[in-house]
Regions:
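Bacterial N-terminal signal peptides that target proteins for export
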Residues: 1-7
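Active-site neighborhood of phospho(di)ester-bond hydrolases with catalytic His/Asp-centered motifs
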Residues: 35-37, 93-100, 128-134, 233-236, ...
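Extended active-site neighborhood of metal-dependent phosphoesterases/phosphodiesterases
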Residues: 105-218, 257-263, 269, 280-333, ...
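Short, solvent-exposed mixed-charge patches
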Residues: 355-358
Length: 358
C-alpha cells in the first residue's frame, strides 16, 4: 500500500482582496472542502478478470472511507503550518468531484458509493458536488441525466448561489468564497476550427462545454463584481500535458478566452482532473518555453500574463481550508503514515495580480 502522505501548499494572504471586507466578516469565514477527481466507478481492466458490481462498490466505499478518515485528523504541526496553528480537519462543506465519475455508464454503482443525499460520516452528511468528464457520456447518457438530477436537488435544497439554465453548471457561495463548477472546461462551444482529434464531435456531443464560459462570466459579473471576494473554479480539463496535447480536448483559443475572462477577479485556485495526478502548479507557467506557451495559447499569448494557482486532483483527496484571508491546500493520501510538507509554497497576491490588467 502506498504510504499516506500530505502535500501541503500554503498560500498566505492569497485571499486579500482589492476591496477588503469588514474585519468581522473575515473573522467569521472558516470554510473546509474536499476535492477529488476521476474515480472512474465501473472501470474494468481488460487484462484482468471482470470485476463484479460488489467488488466495484466495495472498492469505492473503501475510497470514501479513506477520504472521510481525514476528518478530525490534525494538520501538520511543523513547517510553515506551525505558525498558523490550524488544528484539526473539520467536516467539509462539500466533497467536490472534478469529472470522470464513471466508466461504462455505471451511475447505479456511483450513486451507491456517493449517494445523491450526501456521504454520511460520524460527524454528519457531506454534500457531493459534481462536474462531468469525458468518460461520462453524451448529454442524454444515464450519467449526465443523473448529474443533472443531483444539481437540481442541490438547487431545491438552496445550496447553490446560481445554476445555469440547463442545470449543468453552478456555483456555491460559502461565506463569501465563491466556488464554480464548470463541467468539461470553461468554454461555450466546441471549437470548430480545431475539433477533438478523434471522432470530431460537434455541438451537443459529449465534448460540448455547453456555455460554461458564459455562465462563469455572468456569475462573476453579477455575484462577485468588484468586491474582491475569492473565487475557486473547477472543471475537468486542465493545463497539463495530457489536457493540452494534440487531441485538443480543449483548444488554445478556448484557454485564451478563459484567461481573459478572469481579469479583475480574485481567483484563489483553479481545480481540475483528467490527468489522474495530484499536483500544484502555476498557469500560465512563468518559466514556460516558447513552445509550451504556444501550446497553451497558440498565437494569442498574453504579453505579461498573470499566473493562477492550479491544483490537479487525483482520486484521493485535496483538503482546502479558507480562514479569514488565508488559504491552505493540503493533499491527503489515506490512512496510516505521517505528513509530507513538501512542496511548500508561501506567497502573497499583489493588487496588480488581482486586477489582472496587462
Amino acid at each position: 500500500m502506498q504510504v499516506a502522505r500530505w502535500m501541503v501548499a500554503i498560500l498566505v494572504a492569497v485571499l486579500v482582496p482589492v476591496h477588503v471586507p469588514a474585519a468581522d466578516a473575515l473573522a467569521e469565514r472558516d470554510v473546509t472542502f474536499f476535492v477529488i477527481s476521476d474515480p472512474h466507478i465501473g472501470f474494468q481492466d481488460q487484462n484482468k478478470p471482470t470485476r463484479s458490481t460488489e467488488d466495484i462498490i466495495g472498492d469505492g466505499r473503501r475510497q470514501v472511507e479513506r477520504i472521510t478518515g481525514v476528518i478530525g485528523t490534525p494538520y501538520p504541526d511543523g513547517g510553515p503550518l506551525a505558525a498558523l496553528a490550524p488544528g484539526t480537519v473539520a467536516t467539509p462543506r462539500g466533497l467536490l468531484i472534478a469529472g470522470d465519475l464513471t466508466d461504462n455508464q455505471r451511475w447505479d454503482a456511483f450513486t451507491t458509493i456517493f449517494p445523491p443525499a450526501g456521504v454520511t460520516t460520524a460527524t454528519g452528511s457531506i454534500p457531493v458536488f459534481l462536474c462531468v468528464g469525458n468518460h461520462d457520456g453524451d448529454p442524454d447518457s444515464p450519467v449526465r441525466r443523473g448529474v443533472l438530477e443531483v444539481n437540481r436537488a442541490h438547487e431545491r435544497a438552496r445550496r447553490l448561489a446560481a445554476i445555469s439554465d440547463d442545470g449543468m453548471h453552478y456555483a456555491v457561495n460559502w461565506d463569501g468564497l465563491h466556488v464554480l463548477c464548470l463541467g468539461l472546461c470553461p468554454a461555450d462551444t466546441v471549437d470548430v476550427e480545431m475539433p477533438f482529434k478523434y471522432g470530431k464531435p460537434g455541438p451537443g456531443s459529449w465534448n460540448d462545454p455547453r456555455q460554461a464560459l458564459s455562465f462563469m462570466k455572468k456569475y462573476l459579473r453579477e455575484h462577485v463584481g468588484t468586491s474582491g471576494q475569492p473565487v475557486v473554479l473547477m472543471h475537468h480539463y486542465g493545463f497539463d500535458g495530457f489536457s493540452t496535447n494534440d487531441w485538443y480536448w480543449w483548444t488554445p483559443q478556448q484557454r485564451r478566452a478563459y484567461y481573459d475572462a478572469l481579469a479583475g477577479y480574485n481567483v484563489a485556485a483553479i481545480l481540475h482532473g483528467h490527468d489522474h495526478h495530484a499536483a500544484h502548479y502555476l498557469w500560465p507557467n512563468p518559466e514556460a518555453s516558447a513552445e509550451e506557451t504556444r501550446r497553451q495559447f497558440g498565437d494569442q499569448s498574453p504579453p505579461a500574463p498573470r499566473t493562477f494557482d492550479v491544483f490537479s486532483c487525483g482520486n484521493l483527496c485535496w483538503v482546502f481550508r479558507v480562514t479569514g484571508d488565508q488559504f491552505v491546500a493540503a493533499h491527503y493520501g489515506g490512512h496510516g503514515a505521517g505528513w509530507d510538507t513538501e512542496p511548500v509554497i508561501v506567497k502573497s497576491v499583489t493588487s496588480r495580480n488581482l486586477s489582472g490588467k496587462e
